[in-house]
Amino acid sequence: MKQKPDLSFWKLWNLSFGFFGVQIAYALQSANISRIFRTLGADPHDLSYFWILPPLMGMIVQPIVGTLSDKTWCRLGRRIPYLFVGAFVAVAVMCLLPNAGSLGLAISQVMIFGLIMLMLLDTSINMAMQPFKMMVGDMVNEKQKAKAYSIQSFLCNAGSVVGFLFPYVFAAVGLANVAAPGIVPPTVVWSFYIGAAILIICVLYTTLKVKEWPPKEYEEYNGKANLSENVEETKKSEKSDWITLLRNAPATFWKVGLVQFFCWAALLYMWTYVVDAVAETVWDTRDSSSEAYQIAGNWTGVLYAIQAMGSVFWATMLPRFKNTKMAYAVSLVLGGIGFALIPFVPSQFGQIVPFLLIGCAWAAMLAMPFTFVTNALQGYGHMGTYLGLFNCTICLPQIIAAICGGFILHLVGGHSATMMIVAGVLLVCGAACVGFIHDKK
């Protein structure tokens, strides 16, 4: 195989620039889905069930996009057609979902419509997100991959901060933050509109600026094993061997998976209940149609942005730990403390501290698990398949947590703020399980 050429900074930037828009859409979804469904009239005890869809669609869509795009070649390229289609569907759904309460439907019909829109939004965001990772793998040499993923990480965090802040900024400039009962306020509706516009602009930019290698050139740099005529055979071989691979997986694979279970269950409860938790704790309200609740929703977006910025800072601290396991465990404990503090901090600005601590856990969750697993898998082969299977340790815990969320909320008296303590306990349990991991250097 030929050595892939070095790419200029701007070529690396163009490969991932569309990710900025996709991440804005993802941040708007993460921060506002519970708020939207509560405003539409969903019972808090049913709220977690809506959150089954995001991880479920991630498990289904990402492998399909990967497999199909391996076998695709057209005028737009190999990966970009899926990015393009996913982005356009996401834009359409982002314009429809926040208007679900304005269509004159009965509440049951509104919920069904909202669920269909959420499923399409999850599907399209996953469809638009996956090609960026693949294009780096396709076109960037080993020497530059760290730089390429650093650019992608920067755009990811920048997009998250922008998406989280939109409702707060629109309220600050005078857009109405309350609406009639069952209607999503203009601050949220326009956040989705502007997010959709930025998404399509960013994706169009990447589409126009990036030229993927045609099949012959792709073969020269990536080998025949990746070409479309061999994909079906490879796919069948991998499918038949998944059970064997899991049986032979190193113990670290399963031990890190156990830590992942507690971590991602905790994060699912944050995404589901934190708007209600902040509204209860700081503004003393559970009424989703009240002005106070909508202010809490906007402020939660600010807190998410602060968490993202805290995560970036803590990521620079992690390499300073001499012991990787210690860094992982300490980060999760700090995050657990952050979650547990949320119900006990009645100050709007005081809530910044818990979210900074949660950012520490988030930074470790993004970096540490794959470090341990890839170290342990050295010499095993099938690295790509193992990492694909390891993705289930992110999705399955969220699905299980979502199924159990309503029952646990009932056990804690229906107080969403108390669910933050549950999330904190889960993170501390995850930190305790870090001790079982044996890091292979």
Specify the residue positions occupied by each region the protein language model found.
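Intracellular loop-helix junctions on the cytosolic face of multi-pass helical membrane proteins
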Residues: 1-9, 101, 105-116, 127-128, ...
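Intracellular juxtamembrane helix-capping segments at the cytosolic ends
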Residues: 127-140, 364-379
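Loop-to-transmembrane helix entry
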Residues: 43-53, 186, 284-308, 418
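Hydrophobic core of transmembrane alpha-helices in multi-pass small-molecule transporters
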Residues: 93-128, 350-366
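C-terminal ends and interior cores of transmembrane alpha-helices
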Residues: 83-108, 334-346
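C-terminal transmembrane helical hairpin of 12-TM major facilitator-type secondary transporters
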Residues: 325-369
